[in-house]
Amino acid sequence: MMQRWVLLLAMLVSVAGFALNHYASQSPDSKSTHTSQSEFSAERAFDLLARLLGDESPHPVGSAENARVKDEILTWLAEQEIDATVQQAWGCAHSGSRCAWVENIVATLPGKHNGPYVALMVHYDSVPPAPGAGDDGAGLAAVLEAARLLKASGPTQYPVMLIITDAEEAGLLGAEAFFKQHDLRQQISAVINIEGSGSSG
């Protein structure tokens, strides 16, 4: 009798654990584009991703389509009244075997204090055979929606920087150019890099 009770209890705990795990792993419902401007909206980010991707052509570094994506990002940042500049520089791999002319977008949001920046980093170029929706378009759209929210919510404690690099797929060349050459590179206390890591999970 005791063994049956223990077995039943173990089964009940297992089922409850499975149900709790299943519930905890569910994504929350996404917020619509009509959600308050003071909240993050996945649907707003998805709409922005569609705008950035255009006709879904690949946009590797140096291509006309990559220039279009860059201009679309700059237009969107201007619409949000977020200050942005373009760093134009040669970016080279450590070995010097690969170099490219890169156009990184650097945007800043002021904070209540003048302390170092917290940087959100993402890239906008794609690999040559794909439009880059997952790597790194979705990350880019999420970072831009987060920036919109931060701007709408008023200043954060410390300033925030968006580092939107070019030529990531060619070997992190945009990041190399930023961290070796940009005037603000030593005014950053933390970097949160948002990178595509596949589309299967």
Positions of the model-derived regions?
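Hydrophobic membrane-insertion alpha-helices, especially the h-region
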Residues: 4-21
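Short beta-strand element of the alpha/beta-hydrolase
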Residues: 117-123
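Acidic/histidine-rich catalytic neighborhood of metal-dependent amide-processing enzymes
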Residues: 126-201
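Proline/glycine-enriched tight loop/beta-turn segments at coil->beta junctions
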Residues: 111-117
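Extracytoplasmic/secreted proteins, especially bacterial periplasmic and envelope-associated proteins
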Residues: 44-51, 68-79, 84, 138, ...
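N-terminal capping segment at the start of a domain
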Residues: 18-70, 80, 124-126, 199
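A non-catalytic alpha/beta surface segment that caps or lines the substrate-entry region
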Residues: 50-110
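Solvent-exposed, acidic/flexible segments
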Residues: 38-45, 59-70, 99-100, 117, ...
